[in-house]
Amino acid sequence: MRPAGPSRREIGWALLLCVVYVALSLALRLATGPALEVDEAEVWLQAQLGYALGYGPQFPLYYWIQFGLFDVFGKSLAVVDIFRSTLMALTVFFAFLALRQAVGAMSSSLAAASLIFLPDYAWVSQMTLTHTRIMAALAMATFVAFAWFLRTGRMAAIVWLGVALGLGGLSKPNFWLVPIMLSLAALSIPAYRARMRDKRLLLALVIGAAIVVAPYGWIILHPTEALASINKLALPKPETRMIVTLIGLFDLTKWALYAMLPLVFLVAIFRSFCAHRTDDRPPDAEVFAQFCMRAAIAGFAIAILFVVLSGAGQFKSHWLMFATPFAAFALVLPLLARMSLLQRRIWGALAILAVIGTQTSLAVQRGTPPATQALDAEALAQDLEQRFGADRLTVIGDFYWSGNLARTRPDWDVRALTPPGSVDGEILMLTKLPIQSPEGILRWLKLGEWSAGQQVVLTPAFIAPSTEDRPVFARILTPPG
């Protein structure tokens, strides 16, 4: 029998678990260091810009929602962490809703919880990857819409898909690979092909386009700002294209293995213990597992094609988070069908232990100097006041330093390390790395006529003793005349 989708009771329990996770994350974050992490500091500082159609190379959705939460609940570390952990929880929640369209409640719960065995989701996203977090949540929301539509063909699923496409398109550019690979996977399966010919799907594209049209118009009109981080791809010169592309493919392979090996290893262990059991998946569940596998294969193939066509010499593991969840579901769903009830409970217990272990490890890491959260921002602010009179200057710097100073001294003129525009008087520049060529940084800041003073190395205080320093490099920039 075809699953009827999640019941209200199942949705209620899933949401309750999400609330528990958010509460646990918040309690541990507030208990492990008062300073902002790098991504937290970025959001804190960018809030000065207010609502805009574009924020340089970053897509706007994360900022819009975070700034809205600041407006409603006030600007605090708690609000930043609640939004972050809510996105983490929603990623699993949406995965459960999507999987529940084809498999039972227990299998869909355990498969969705298996995301905790992906390093980029379980660990890296907890500390950084702000915009990747919201992309992953909206990728799963898109998965819900696809799965719901493939099961029922309902108009509500098409509307959901359109909204998910529009919001996802405002999260990160690699989000667009999600609907592409899901469409390719669905078209490759005869049971789903008829649904994909439904002309009502054009409505989803119209809804999505209506949501993204204004921000994408800003991107078209401001290409320099929008492409400011393209150097991350390490694009080659024509004469080195082949070798750089090979390096990029090696990088992609390396990070794909890093992203999937822990889960592959765990699946192999469990499969060895239930090899004698018959795979008792119902036909719909079997087709859905194939759908997930083909979507993952399409995603990885698109990533390879991108590296080859662009010549990108660098690839990062979290860029694959549009595809790795589907690979996880494709691995876990067939395994769950072969497991006994006891083995399923063990799998669930391991997922719970992984959540607890990850949160505990993060708490230890966050509170261990020179971890970013252990910075004594008040002591740093006092030092800058005494040395440079920073309270009377415009302070620009890397997000980490500037964000923490803006939080500690809200009355200061603190800005990101970008061209500052109109400034009255001198500028105090703070960087995490030494500036070897002050003339170059002045040109980049569009302060070509300014002069740079002597670089001063400061050693900020941390709230606990540390054997390792995290220096900050300071310079006074003086206007001409």
What are these regions (language model features)?
Residues R29-W44, G54-L69, K75-A78, P223, ...:
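Extracytoplasmic catalytic/substrate-binding loops of multi-pass membrane glycan-assembly enzymes
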Residues I82-V103, F117, A122, A141-A145:
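Transmembrane-helix motifs of polytopic, lipid-linked glycan transferases
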Residues A102, T142-W160:
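Membrane-interface transmembrane helices that cradle and orient dolichyl/undecaprenyl
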Residues Q126-I134:
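Short acidic/glycine- and proline-prone juxtamembrane loop motifs at membrane-interface regions
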Residues A157-K172, L184, G208-A210:
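Membrane-interface alpha helices of multi-pass inner-membrane proteins
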Residues P179-F288:
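Transmembrane-lumen/periplasm boundary regions of multi-pass, lipid-linked membrane glycan transferases
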Residues P370-A374, E378, Q382-I435:
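Short periplasmic/luminal acceptor-recognition loop of GT-C membrane glycosyltransferases, typified by
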Residues G421-G481:
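Aromatic/acidic, Gly/Pro-rich catalytic loop(s) in extracytoplasmic/lumenal soluble domains
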